UniProtKB/Swiss-Prot annotation:
The gene is rplS. This protein is located at the 30S-50S ribosomal subunit interface and may play a role in the structure and function of the aminoacyl-tRNA binding site. One of its GO terms (molecular function) is structural constituent of ribosome. This is Large ribosomal subunit protein bL19. One of its GO terms (biological process) is translation. Belongs to the bacterial ribosomal protein bL19 family.
């Protein structure tokens, strides 16, 4: 049991930007295409965070050309370059699945957190 925790702790990322559900983020993710490697940004609203430790994931949703696109990222993945928080959102739910039913601009409307 301690061996698993030791291996897990050395693979955990230390420099993760703190963010919450409802925040609008831009995720920079390394994509490997053949022999090339490039960084692909994905911007949207965080609708879910789940898991803990090395298995923690988060899901980002955006509307692209009228179609909702969701992408789930492992938080401690070596391919995750950085996470940039664009706007802080104020929500009262841990999972924002209700955004899936919304159409148009309502799908991206979340109250902004005043700091």
């Amino acid at each position: 049991m301690d061996l698993i925790k030791a291996v897990e702790s050395e693979q955990l990322k230390k420099d993760i930007t703190p963010f919450n559900v409802g925040d609008t983020v831009r995720v920079y993710y390394k994509v490997i295409e053949g022999d090339r490697e490039r960084i692909q940004p994905f911007e949207g609203i965080v609708i879910k965070r789940s898991g803990s430790g090395l298995r923690e994931t988060f899901t980002v949703r955006r509307v692209s050309y009228g179609v909702g696109v969701e992408r789930t990222f492992p938080l401690h993945s070596p391919r995750l370059e950085k996470i940039e928080v664009i706007r802080r959102g104020k929500v009262r739910r841990a999972k924002l699945y209700y955004l899936r039913k919304r159409v148009g601009k309502a799908a991206t409307k979340i109250k902004e957190l005043m700091e």
